[in-house]
Amino acid sequence: MNGIIVIAHAPLASALRECVLHVFPDAAPCLQALDIPAQQTPEASLEQLRALLRESGASDHLLLTDLVGATPCNVASQSTDGVHTRLLAGVNLPMLLRAVSYRHEALDTLCER
């Protein structure tokens, strides 16, 4: 099963995760959220994300961010050293619900859906 991590400006990532868990409560182990507060340094955010990737237990990860070029997306693009990931920007609730419903598919197939 793929790990899915939402990385977004606070509090969007946590809010999206909570909405999805309302529909898919069994997805909690594979769905993580990383809220990036305005005052947090990119280095601190990167370390938090790397910790989530290490601790997730999944071999593949789908990283979903809010805005291309913003800190969450930049942090996500730097976190992939040695980890099999795919990064998609523009996360929204329908996208995340779809990703969670197909979380058992191969990572490349999941990204195409």
PLM features per residue range, with description:
Residues 1-113:
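N-terminal loops that bind phosphate or other acidic moieties
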